[in-house]
Amino acid sequence: KNYYTWSLTDMQGYVGGYNGNSLWGMDEKLILVDGVPRNIDYISPTEISQITFLKGAQAVVLYGSRAAKGVIMITTKRGKSTDLQVDVRANTGFYVAKSYPEYLGSAEYMTLYNEARANDGLGALYSAEDIYHYGSGENPYRYANVNMYSSDYIKKAYNRSDVTAEISGGNHRAHFYTNINYLRSNDVFKIGEAKHNGTNGLNIRGNVDLTLNDFITAYVNAKVSFYSRRSANGSYYWSAASTLRPNRISPLIPLSYIDANAASAWDLVANSNNIVDGKYFLAGTQSDMTNVFGDYYASGYSKATDRSFQFDAGVNIGLDKVLKGLSFHTRFSVDYSTAYITSYNNSYATYAPTWSNNGGKDIIVGLTKYNEDKKSGVQNISGSSDNQTVLFS
């Protein structure tokens, strides 16, 4: 059983006709939170008391033309006339992949590629000696055999945790409810800046209901949320995982392979800003001057931030003394949200090794440098937006 703490994720498993984005395949549905049209992003299920779905004539009669494509009405929890109650819930769990694709290794790929060329009447591209070296595993840095689904790059599982505190109470004159929710989710990657990928979120919702006298009641609702999502620059890891040939490139090569007498090679790596763990340099080729591994290690990161504030208040007046069943309702609401992305965008150099063999030992006798290491230290801001909605009825 899945447990989520935002939006209406997986609600389609409980409500017929709801597909996660619309009602019965119809977009632009009207969403009401406590009677106010609102964006439901990041609303926590622990805040929700009831969800009602409407479609068709009854929706239009009640809410006008905006409801022609369906209505989702969310009612949040409220306080009751009880003693102070505090409820704290903590959840933690792990995302575990059921399976990962199992692609061919370099030797198998090269063998089948030669067969494909032979079927087209072409000569072999890879020699038997090359295939032997790539298949032997004797030097995976010279004879690359990259598996991007390997535990060298991604975790078997990653964590997601959240904690929620609900506080409520009151008497016949006033009662209140408060919900405080914090969540943190990590990511599957374990290399470079990507190992710091993750999401943090804080939601705080509160409301107060007042009974001023026998015929006048009032209420106040407020909600604030803060979300941030950090991610390494370079977003094409999974597409590369399914298309990058296993023999194309070794992303990291140990410095220990560089010949002690290769002075020019040592000068190049000595001036590099991106020696990984003090013992690996970023490898590249003329065709792959940058790659997804280099991006994750050296191109920086971005952080997306979302903030929102929601407030509404209303008064209900019973006018039974004037006419039985007559009442007056008024409400005012204001919603404000901002979003922006900050990032550090770096460029980096990669190095193509020139391999040789000395006494049966593979060594690097030279390096060819592509691109330059550049870290400006400038924080870039992009994707900024803000939205304000005011309602009075």
Regions found by a protein language model. Give the residues of each.
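Conserved residues at the C-terminal ends of beta-strands
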Residues: 54
